[in-house]
Amino acid sequence: MSTRRLAALAVAAALLAAAQAQANEVVHVPSRDGTVLNAVLIRPEGAGPHPAVILLHGCGGRDARSGALDPRHADWAERLAGAGFVVLLPESFASRGQGPQCTVRDRRILPWRERRADALGARDWLAAQPFVRAEAIALMGWSHGGSTVLAAADAPGFAAFVAFYPGCSRALRAAAFAPAAPLLLLIGEADDWTGPEPCRALAERAGLAVTYVGYPGAYHGFDAPGSQVRLRTGLAFTVRGDGTAHVGTDPAARADALARVPSWLAERVRR
């Protein structure tokens, strides 16, 4: 390859890196409990105003060990921004000096307490931005973040809710569960970490307010990009109570979710 060609490729790579750096902006978002949250903001093309979606990480936190967004979060954020959504990813654990919580039984950061406050604070912050349609903000989360979606589902000001494989038992035990906006629940029918049964029962009780999608044979984390199914150990809470659960990609379930969720959200935030 010629020197000129190599130089051109180097310039192109530098421009791409600069564009990506501009696309992923670090912002500071006040939680309703007063905590200042580190958050990543990704804006679609155009001045807007655009619909927006808040993405809530699971018990492992928002970022990979490298410091970049976890591959699942990065994948979804890129796809949703490409579909015209402003995307905000607050980090609930590191912002409070805490690490991953998957193996922690005595958790200091809970879906119905700190993380609900974070979700509402993120909504407040987005609603104040001139490039966001304040009436078109959705909330979406995975596992611990999905449980947070359920905990915040009674709050006004959201256009839609999406929860991937949440823990549904607490919501099911509540005297009433009435989402303030449509809720989409997606879970693997073989999930042995949070378990599908409470979520299925919750959806049946809630009626038309909740859409339940169960994927036969899929485990926890089925929508992750290229994650081989494996058995995790040492987890704090699992279906069997022995600290073990399977996680990993299910290609068919992932493909369905990647097509279903953006379309479903677009329908709920349409003008």
Give residue ranges: language-model regions:
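Alpha/beta-hydrolase fold nucleophile elbow
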Residues: F131-G141
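Acidic catalytic loop of the alpha/beta-hydrolase fold
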Residues: A190-T194, H220-G221
